[in-house]
């Protein structure tokens, strides 16, 4: 299922060569701040002593998705990338400008809607261009780490591309609590990699600008399971899963029928029954109380943590096995 024509005998990134048994930190200069400070994207390359697959681990494509950044940073600090076979390319923080501005986008542009990018386009487009130009030709598959946005908390989950057998296989190996197929989005990183026949799975866990220890640990454990499966690292006892991933076949958003103050009565990731009360919406004077009920038997995939809502706002993302 996975190609045996491995690419890690010698990788060339930014005119630097990384041979078998070598590890390097390569910095791609992106732009300067108005103060003249140079902004560089640090890329860590860990090439094992033996031929094997090359995997890209990418965090911070959206600058405010701190869990994605923290879990890759923590793996660096804990020296989890002791690679024996194959190569791991790690980008803990791609969207540095968004990170500095505490925002999802880069100068108003969504990097994940800017692929394949342009050498002379917007800053987001240029970042996408250099990522595709410098890295993708070296990669066999990738894990793209994200969190929920807009104060929506995603229960740890893996998303893969429909009808992509290799993506589905990777999702099963990762073994997050929840998994499901998700349609490709035009100009996204996953879509562009799909065009280049590179499978990408997306890990979602927690919400933007908030560290979530459970989401971080699930992301680390799933990543180690993938590395172990391909014999890139030695066995590590603590990566054994305590759960089997639940495969969801249908998903939908439960939206607010009225405006008001919202309170959830179920926890994220919990099993739910059709007709079960998931939360309540009251007006600011306590005169009305609208019960939010589940339309399906299934699980809570994501939960809105913002208390002030308007009609039509998403409250829960729910899925059916």
Question: Where do the PLM segments sit?
Answer:
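Structured catalytic-domain cores with a bias toward divalent-metal coordination
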Residues: 1-321
